[in-house]
């Protein structure tokens, strides 16, 4: 009998980034030290310093990884939609309010929230990779073929849902979420 190949364990850089995310999620940016990230990643401090020579470099890498993840999820959400006016807005609606085609989990949102807060409190310039992704998204929304303000309203509502989760302000019930989604969906229907 042939054994199935074992999955390759994550490389040291990925383990360090995963550990840093978990630390900022559990203890905030103040809890993130190079020593703690190295320990939790199972590498020496020298091994960590080989990849990231400072806390700022580590946080910067976390934000770049998050920006890449956001861009990939956003593009996948668009690809899942049919061509034509409102495609970007439908994707944003599904991404922000949930749909079978979206793969972002609560755990991913929580980790993203922790990284956003860590960067915001440590050095707001670290958010520049995220700002670049958002600028591309906004350009796509402007060219989406909907009446002015419709795509922006859908995006702002999705951002509001993320902020409510980020700051633990409230969690809408599934019924409330469905009602909001239906109301926002009417903004997209104008394009059809």
For each predicted feature, which ranges?
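N-terminal intrinsically disordered/low-complexity leader segments
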Residues: 1-11
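Solvent-exposed, amphipathic alpha-helical segments
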Residues: 19-26, 73-76, 157-164
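Generic transmembrane alpha-helix motif of multi-pass integral membrane proteins
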Residues: 113-120
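Hydrophobic/aromatic-rich alpha-helical bundle segments in the mid-to-C-terminal region
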Residues: 103-107, 124-192
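Short, basic, alpha-helical segments at the C-terminal edge of helix-turn-helix-like DNA-binding modules
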Residues: 64-69
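Helix-turn-helix
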Residues: 15, 19, 23-57, 61
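Hydrophobic alpha-helical connector segments
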Residues: 72-111
């Amino acid at each position: 009998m042939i054994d199935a190949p074992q999955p390759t364990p994550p490389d040291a850089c990925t383990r360090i980034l995963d550990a840093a995310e978990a630390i900022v999620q559990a203890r905030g940016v103040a809890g993130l030290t190079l020593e703690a990230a190295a320990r939790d990643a199972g590498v020496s401090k020298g091994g960590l310093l080989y990849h990231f020579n400072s806390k700022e470099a580590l946080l910067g890498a976390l934000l770049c990884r998050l920006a890449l993840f956001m861009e990939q999820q956003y593009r996948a959400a668009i690809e899942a939609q049919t061509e034509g006016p409102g495609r970007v807005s439908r994707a944003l609606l599904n991404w922000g309010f949930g749909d079978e085609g979206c793969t972002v989990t609560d755990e991913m949102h929580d980790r993203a929230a922790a990284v956003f807060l860590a960067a915001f409190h440590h050095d707001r310039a670290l958010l520049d990779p995220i700002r670049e992704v958002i600028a591309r998204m906004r350009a796509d929304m402007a060219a989406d073929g909907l009446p002015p303000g419709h795509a922006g309203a859908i995006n702002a509502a999705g951002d509001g849902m993320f902020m409510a989760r980020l700051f633990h302000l409230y969690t809408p019930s599934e019924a409330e979420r469905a009602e909001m989604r239906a109301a926002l969906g009417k903004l997209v229907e104008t394009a059809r």
